[in-house]
Amino acid sequence: MSLQAVIEAAFERRAEITPKTVDVETRVAIETVIEKLDSGEYRVAEKIGGEWVTHQWLKKAVLLSFRINDNQIIDGAETKYYDKVALKFADYTESRFAEEGFRVVPSATVRKGAYIAKNCVLMPSYVNIGAYVGEGTMVDTWATVGSCAQIGKNVHLSGGVGIGGVLEPLQANPTIIGDNCFIGARSEVVEGVIVEEGCVISMGVFIGQSTRIYDRETGEIHYGRVPAGSVVVSGSLPSKCGKYSLYCAVIVKKVDAKTLGKVGINELLRTIEE
């Protein structure tokens, strides 16, 4: 059977799979997928024909990986850990770090099966299994990149940002942050929301599938997707009865790539009333 066929068949009987009962073919298939996700050869989601496509069988392999290993001691410099998933950098040498070309600041944690591209900087942060972090991206202090999340090139995830995963609670599709996006401090993007290329999300903005994303120029309301080039802040919209307001994210303006390249992030956010 093909790698995908083995994974699909195993997922159908996942409740029966334990570290003691898993057969060799299934274990090898799962571990092969994790290795290919780790190297960036496979991605849980990718853009095909201009649209994001989720490879569900790869996500299933990530889920299955939790079924085939017992918890074990993991050495972590000043302490120890006890988990089923190995750490990505456990066997890295100085030459391998140099070859792969990214920086990892002490206390940053990346699980095996996550891909980190060249010129990335990982401050003390957390990147979960199956995630993809594109070239030139900064994952700032206390930011978290959830399981299978897809982060584009030249993205800045500011301090304390949370990008949701697919494992807990179980989600159909990963959260996606497009190329050249800025996600402000303490913001959360979860539940498979897609933030398209070149967006600027202000600090403290929370976006899930049920969050109304209101475009103040057009009056249009989006769900689950922030259009390319949007500058977004937190806000509220009045209820139908007019007695209260409910949270929303507000698109205050649109910028193209040229403007984004010339104008600082702070300037874009300071001029939202124009």
From Swiss-Prot:
GO terms for molecular function: 2,3,4,5-tetrahydropyridine-2,6-dicarboxylate N-succinyltransferase activity; nucleotidyltransferase activity. Substrate binds at R103, D140. It is an enzyme of class 2 (transferase). Keywords: Acyltransferase, Amino-acid biosynthesis, Cytoplasm, Diaminopimelate biosynthesis, Lysine biosynthesis, Repeat, Transferase. One of its GO terms (biological process) is lysine biosynthetic process via diaminopimelate. SUPFAM superfamilies: Trimeric LpxA-like enzymes (SSF51161). Pathway: Amino-acid biosynthesis; L-lysine biosynthesis via DAP pathway; LL-2,6-diaminopimelate from (S)-tetrahydrodipicolinate (succinylase route): step 1/3. It catalyses: (S)-2,3,4,5-tetrahydrodipicolinate + succinyl-CoA + H2O = (S)-2-succinylamino-6-oxoheptanedioate + CoA. InterPro entries: DapD_Trfase_Hexpep_rpt_fam (IPR005664), Hexapep (IPR001451), Hexapep_transf_CS (IPR018357), THP_succinylTrfase_dom1 (IPR023180), THP_succinylTrfase_N_sf (IPR037133), Trimer_LpxA-like_sf (IPR011004). One of its GO terms (cellular component) is cytoplasm. It is found in: Cytoplasm. Its main location: cytoplasm. Its EC number is 2.3.1.117. Belongs to the transferase hexapeptide repeat family. Homotrimer. This is 2,3,4,5-tetrahydropyridine-2,6-dicarboxylate N-succinyltransferase. It comes from Haemophilus ducreyi (strain 35000HP / ATCC 700724). The gene is dapD.
